[in-house]
Structure formats: structure tokens, C-alpha cells
């Protein structure tokens, strides 16, 4: 049983590590994002994109960190933010 649990944990770790290597992170500056509702809407719109894994918006900095698979394009992110009548630019 102990060997089975160890093997299972190692497998999960290997899968997680492999998945981490298949993602990229991008930081966007969204100038119009200045309240909690704005941040919520930006997060929601970006998470609707197929391939976006997670987002984290900071209204203090006006930045959104997006973790995505490599197939997601910057234009897809810009288009999603533009639906809210906001503008975005890549910071990193």
C-alpha cells in the first residue's frame, strides 16, 4: 500500500511538472481597470478564452497576470479585454 501511494504521488508530481512546462505567463497592463468590478470583469472575460488556465488582476497596479497554454495568442487576450471597452498592452 505504501508503494502504491508513493507511486501515485510521484505520478501526480510528474504530471504537474509536465503541465507546468506546457504553459506560459504574460502580464498585461489594463489602464481602465480601477475598481473591483473592473478586475472581476477582466478576469471573467479572459478566463472564457479556451486555453487560459488562470488570471489574477491587481487594481492597485492595473496589471493582469495570465497563465495560459502556448496556443493562446496575445490578440485573443486583447480582443477579450476590448469587449469591455478597455485597452491592454503587454508588460513582459
Curated annotation (Swiss-Prot):
Binding sites annotated in the UniProt record for a metal cation: 35, 38
Listed GO MF terms: metal ion binding
Pfam families: HMA
Classification via CDD domains: HMA (cd00371)
Source taxon at top rank: Bacteria
Occurrences of domain HMA (ranges): 24-89
UniProt entry keywords in alphabetical sequence: Metal-binding
Family matches, as SUPFAM superfamilies: HMA, heavy metal-associated domain
Name the record gives this protein: Uncharacterized protein HI_1050
Lineage per the UniProt record: Bacteria, Pseudomonadati, Pseudomonadota, Gammaproteobacteria, Pasteurellales
